[in-house]
Amino acid sequence: MKYIEVDEELYRFIASKTERIGESASDILRRLLTLPVDTVTPFEPNAIDEPSLDVAHHQASNFAASNQEQQTGHGHAGEPSAVQTPESNDYAKAQPHSSGYQPGQLEGHKSEPQTLAQLNSQPLAVGQSSQSATSQVDFNALVNEHLLSQQKGAVGRFMWLLEGLAALAPSQFNKVLLVQGKGRLYFARSKDELLASSASANPKEIGTTGYWVTTNNNTAKKQAILVEVLTKLHCDETLASAIADRICDKVAG
């Protein structure tokens, strides 16, 4: 059996010549062309296996059987239904309570609401403080006139004051890294980092802290840098300016 395509007009013409029910297009054309009409077995395409349809049919059958058992009450005890649906009572009973996150509740622990008095009576954890996170630093103790006078020049006094400040506030001294110029570093954790910022930085390490500072600037700039460092550590601005003035030769002398 062969297949051909015909236009709409020709199709309607052939169909209009049908004389009996079940007459095929081949029979009609043979009759119109006065050709012998043979009994031709109509072509039937081979069935195509579709496993997905079989599975769907199987699930639908199980679903129907499950519903019928629930309605008639003839289901076997201890045997779960093939398919459970939200409408079934068994399914609803099988659903656990919501296990999503609940505020104040951790796995295996149910917290109880606490009053403000209870919270205030609890001890603080290690590292916490009821006061400001910034520890109280006695900045007046930074200047020792005798030792300061023994330092060599403005650079020596500048370095000595920074080293003393690191000893007074070791946990906060990393804030010096926040003191920067326009496109230039004043403090760093390595000599190379300062030299990369400025080849003429003349970096020096602040004691043995691991922090480095540039020293190739004039005295006024050193004073401005020290004032900013002190205020970063929450020193009073007036006191910070007074301490920074000790870098100057006239004041120190």
From Swiss-Prot:
<dbReference type="GO" id="GO:0005737">
    <property type="term" value="C:cytoplasm"/>
</dbReference>
<dbReference type="InterPro" id="IPR026577">
    <property type="entry name" value="SeqA_DNA-bd_C"/>
</dbReference>
<dbReference type="Pfam" id="PF03925">
    <property type="entry name" value="SeqA"/>
</dbReference>
<comment type="function">
    <text>Negative regulator of replication initiation, which contributes to regulation of DNA replication and ensures that replication initiation occurs exactly once per chromosome per cell cycle. Binds to pairs of hemimethylated GATC sequences in the oriC region, thus preventing assembly of replication proteins and re-initiation at newly replicated origins. Repression is relieved when the region becomes fully methylated.</text>
</comment>
<dbReference type="Pfam" id="PF17206">
    <property type="entry name" value="SeqA_N"/>
</dbReference>
<keyword id="KW-0236">DNA replication inhibitor</keyword>
<dbReference type="GO" id="GO:0006355">
    <property type="term" value="P:regulation of DNA-templated transcription"/>
</dbReference>
<comment type="similarity">
    <text>Belongs to the SeqA family.</text>
</comment>
<dbReference type="InterPro" id="IPR005621">
    <property type="entry name" value="SeqA"/>
</dbReference>
<dbReference type="GO" id="GO:0003677">
    <property type="term" value="F:DNA binding"/>
</dbReference>
<dbReference type="InterPro" id="IPR033761">
    <property type="entry name" value="SeqA_N"/>
</dbReference>
<comment type="subunit">
    <text>Homodimer. Polymerizes to form helical filaments.</text>
</comment>
<keyword id="KW-0238">DNA-binding</keyword>
<dbReference type="InterPro" id="IPR010985">
    <property type="entry name" value="Ribbon_hlx_hlx"/>
</dbReference>
<feature type="region of interest" description="Disordered">
    <location>
        <begin position="66"/>
        <end position="112"/>
    </location>
</feature>
<feature type="region of interest" description="Interaction with DNA">
    <location>
        <begin position="154"/>
        <end position="155"/>
    </location>
</feature>
<protein>
    <recommendedName>
        <fullName>Negative modulator of initiation of replication</fullName>
    </recommendedName>
</protein>
<dbReference type="InterPro" id="IPR036835">
    <property type="entry name" value="SeqA_DNA-bd_C_sf"/>
</dbReference>
<keyword id="KW-0963">Cytoplasm</keyword>
<dbReference type="InterPro" id="IPR013321">
    <property type="entry name" value="Arc_rbn_hlx_hlx"/>
</dbReference>
<dbReference type="GO" id="GO:0032297">
    <property type="term" value="P:negative regulation of DNA-templated DNA replication initiation"/>
</dbReference>
